[in-house]
């Protein structure tokens, strides 16, 4: 195997680059439709268009305080949402990983562009943004 690689180094490098490009293209097609938002950029999006905000936290956490007009939907129930592919949907939770998982599910369901709030509800609170519900 090593002899083949050394004797065909140009072929090996070309094949390696081709594999990298294919993997990169596939990753971009999956993740390219998911964008992170800062609290400030979320405010701009909310002011500019109709947005569905999905709070992935437990109902107790949601009731204690959530972003105004957010809907409390669990990660398991994301697939039950009726969406149009042009909808603007932003997911958030306690951390990014759950919000990213939800955004990936939405893209798989046909949504062209999904967003998630970077840093979750904690970044929203740290930036002194308004909450709805009991605090």
Positions of predicted regions on the chain:
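Rhodanese-like catalytic fold shared by cysteine-dependent sulfurtransferases
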Residues: 1-40, 48-51, 59-88, 94-135
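Active-site flanking residues adjacent to catalytic metal/cofactor-binding acidic residues
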Residues: 54
């Amino acid at each position: 195997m090593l002899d083949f690689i050394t004797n065909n180094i140009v072929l090996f490098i070309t094949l390696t680059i081709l594999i990298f490009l294919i993997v990169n293209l596939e990753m971009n097609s999956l993740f390219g439709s998911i964008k992170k938002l800062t609290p400030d950029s979320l405010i701009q999006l909310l002011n500019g268009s109709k947005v569905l905000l999905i709070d992935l936290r437990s109902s107790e956490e949601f009731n204690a305080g959530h972003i105004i007009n957010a809907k409390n939907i669990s990660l398991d129930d994301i697939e039950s949402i009726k969406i149009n592919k042009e909808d603007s949907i932003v997911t958030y939770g306690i951390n990014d990983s759950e919000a990213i998982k939800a955004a990936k599910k939405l893209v798989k369901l046909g949504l062209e562009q999904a967003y998630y709030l970077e840093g979750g509800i904690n970044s929203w609170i740290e930036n002194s943004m308004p909450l709805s519900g009991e605090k």
